């Protein structure tokens, strides 16, 4: 099972509505990078090592707010993300609040619940820091409980989801680690997925007690996701063309999201989940070729 990589090309809906990406911007253009070369050929062009105390750097990140996607249980709020002891700490909490968007009789999952029962945080890289090609590293520690859905992922800056392209550098749910790519299908708001996963039984019993390094290596013709230096999934960018608009969503700049979702379509039941629960990020680094 450890060596088995399953490629699934299927059409599915990820969000309850299409997600519109940020407007076109001037971004880091990192150039095609030869990932077979020594790391000394790389230069650091953007990073956050979270070596401050308190709120994350507002020049680098913005926050999602409210109920956002996938019928997840958490209400996103910036208060659940802090920098402490050299880490970004995203905390999932069980706490009850009034839902300010509640509408009596609503059939929309975001507005038909009168209370918020769980909170968490989702950080989004500010648009001026979006990057294209090169290498991104995220060192993080996740808790592998049922109900938790931590993620490291990117979205393209142009177009609505999924035609803007999605890269799930890391997701955890269903007792497995996932690495996925998504492009647009011929049907609006539906994705074609290239997915890979490894069950937690593939890893050492103490795996979740340590930090791990997730890497996205990105050239003009290939993207590859690695976990602790081992390939999890890759995609040929000469063929990753949207069925919807004929564009290649991985030949444009992408921006990063770091979030801890709770429950929802993939996270599972929260009945036995321990709260508060923390997702720790040691650093994010983006490199270009020298």
Which role does the model predict for each range below?
Residues 1-27:
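Bacterial Sec-dependent N-terminal signal peptides
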């Amino acid at each position: 099972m450890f060596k088995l990589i399953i490629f699934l090309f299927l059409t599915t809906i990820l969000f309850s509505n299409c997600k519109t990406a940020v407007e076109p911007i001037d971004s880091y253009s990192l150039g095609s990078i030869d990932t077979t070369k020594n790391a000394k050929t790389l230069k650091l062009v953007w990073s956050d090592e979270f070596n401050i105390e308190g709120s994350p750097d507002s020049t680098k990140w913005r926050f999602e707010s409210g109920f956002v996607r996938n019928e997840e249980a958490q209400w996103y709020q910036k208060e659940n993300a802090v920098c402490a002891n050299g880490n970004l700490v995203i905390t999932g909490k069980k706490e009850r609040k009034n839902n300010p968007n509640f509408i009596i009789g609503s059939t929309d999952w975001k507005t038909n619940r009168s209370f918020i029962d769980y909170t968490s945080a989702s950080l989004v890289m500010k648009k001026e820091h979006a990057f294209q090609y090169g290498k991104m590293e995220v060192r993080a520690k996740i808790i592998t409980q049922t109900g938790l859905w931590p993620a490291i992922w990117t979205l393209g800056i142009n177009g609505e989801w999924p035609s803007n392209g999605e890269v799930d550098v890391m997701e955890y749910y269903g007792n497995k680690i996932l690495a996925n790519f998504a492009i647009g299908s011929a049907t609006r708001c539906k994705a074609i997925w290239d997915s890979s996963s490894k069950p937690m039984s593939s890893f050492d019993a103490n795996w979740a007690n340590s930090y791990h390094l997730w890497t996205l290596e990105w050239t003009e013709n290939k993207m590859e996701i690695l976990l602790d230096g081992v390939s999890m999934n890759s995609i040929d960018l000469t063929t990753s063309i949207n069925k919807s608009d004929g564009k290649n969503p991985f030949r444009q700049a992408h921006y990063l999201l770091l979030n801890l979702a709770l429950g929802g379509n993939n996270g599972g039941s929260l009945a036995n989940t321990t709260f508060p629960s923390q997702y720790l990020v040691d650093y994010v680094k983006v490199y270009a070729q020298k």
